[in-house]
Amino acid sequence: FAYTGSAFIATKEANADQGYKQGIVDGDASGIVYTNLFTGVHGNYLRSSIENAGLDPENLPTSDPSKMNFGSGGNTKAKAWKDIWGSGQGVGAVKSVGTVEDMVARMEAEYHDARASLGQKSSYRIWEA
């Protein structure tokens, strides 16, 4: 089981700001900041979007979780999702803005390559559906 979200933000079909898409492409796991400042719930955000909002990612205050507001920016002028962009640690695997079709084809090819590699390195038989 796996899930992906950030990779789909950086597609031509996504209705996301071009800066957000480029932030996904340029980002990696070290550029993710985990904080509850922007909504009251801890989440992962692109460091570059926090810096672009004039905030210091290393010195963010903690938000009061009893005051959750998913449309706010915490006690900042920046707004979550509009100015402060969420992202997962998988951003390092996104190398360019492309189509959903190309991304899914690449993921499928990577899956088959990994599966074949596991079969060669293991005495276990790969289950066939």
Task: Please identify what each model-predicted range represents.
Residues F1-A129:
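Conserved active-site-proximal phosphate/metal-binding subdomains
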